Every structure is written in C-alpha cells, then in structure tokens.
C-alpha cells in the first residue's frame, strides 16, 4: 500500500474542495441588503391641536405640540404646556391602512406645586397626506386621576406638518 500517495491525493482533494467553496459565488453569497426604507409616517411632526367638544366639534382650547414617530412603532410626544405641569408622552403607533395610522400615548400631569395631578391617555386615528408632509388626526382623550381612575373623556383634533 502506498500511504504517501494516498495521503497526497487526499490532501489534493481537500484543497480542491476548499478552493471550490471559497471561489464559488454561491458559497460566499450574502442576502441582498435592502436600503433602509422607513414608513412615511416616521419623523418629527409639528402639530396644531384643538381640544374640541365631542358632540359639535367646536374648538374649546388650542395649543402647539410636537411628536417624534420612531421607526418600529413607538412615539414620543410633548406640547407647549409648562414643563412643570406636564411630563413627556410616550406611546406607540401602527399602520392600519394606506396612509392611515392608529396612535396611543400617555403622559403625566402635575399641579403647579409639583404634585401628581393624574395622567392623560390619547388614542387617535391619523391620516397622512399623499405627499407625506402633512397629516390630520382625530383623538379620544382620557383624563385620569393620580390613581389612574378615569375621570372624564374629551376629544381632540390635530393638523400637523413634517419638521424639515
């Protein structure tokens, strides 16, 4: 038996197999990388908000607000209330149809002395304009006390533009 010849042939076969696997395009192929393509709702939005009479739609109070819609379905929210009377809002969003979204968020409210007044929960439906640079929203607002019990519900209407 010629052991060195067999070992030499085995080494050659292994070398050819390694070379074939390294040089073969399919052996090193990686999945095609897709460019990052966020939902068109993602971004920073400047809002004009009106708390409205739920029955008539008449504006009762207006204020400015800002939301950041994050990739992946979360959002951050703030408004023009004094920072000592309202905490930041956090929530989530989901796409419900073509340019249609459902949002919900929650923030804490404080008395002027710094004590907790309660919480506000907002649930709304947002329609994104076809150009992706403006939106409208209609929301139901839950005013809750410091123990998180529902006190009253209200309504809000929002128009927004993308911050550029």
Identify the meaning behind each predicted range.
Residues 2-13:
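Bacterial N-terminal signal peptides that target proteins for export
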Residues 138-164:
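Edge beta-strand at a domain terminus
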Residues 11-22:
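Bacterial N-terminal signal peptides
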Residues 102-132, 136:
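Acidic, glycine-rich flexible loop segments
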Residues 38-42, 68-72, 94-101, 126-136, ...:
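A short, structured loop/turn motif at beta-sheet edges
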Residues 58-100, 134:
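N-terminal glycine/threonine-rich, aromatic-flanked beta-hairpin/loop signature
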Residues 37-57, 89-91:
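Tryptophan-anchored aromatic micro-motifs
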Residues 27-31:
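Boundary at the C-terminal end of the N-terminal hydrophobic targeting segment
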């Amino acid at each position: 038996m010629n052991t060195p010849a067999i070992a030499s042939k085995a080494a050659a076969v292994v070398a050819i197999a390694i070379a074939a696997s390294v040089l073969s395009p399919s052996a090193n192929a990686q999945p095609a990388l897709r460019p990052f393509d966020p939902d068109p709702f993602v971004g920073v939005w400047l809002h004009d908000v009106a708390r409205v009479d739920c029955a008539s739609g008449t504006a009762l109070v207006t204020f400015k607000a800002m939301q950041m819609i994050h990739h992946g379905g979360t959002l951050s929210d703030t408004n023009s209330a004094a920072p000592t009377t309202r905490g930041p809002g956090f929530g989530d969003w989901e796409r419900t149809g073509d340019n249609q979204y459902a949002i919900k968020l929650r923030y804490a409210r404080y008395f002027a002395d710094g004590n907790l007044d309660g919480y506000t929960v907002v649930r709304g439906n947002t329609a994104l304009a076809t150009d992706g640079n403006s939106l409208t929203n209609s929301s139901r607002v839950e005013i809750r006390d410091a123990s998180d019990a529902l006190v009253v519900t209200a309504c809000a209407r929002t128009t927004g533009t993308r911050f550029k």
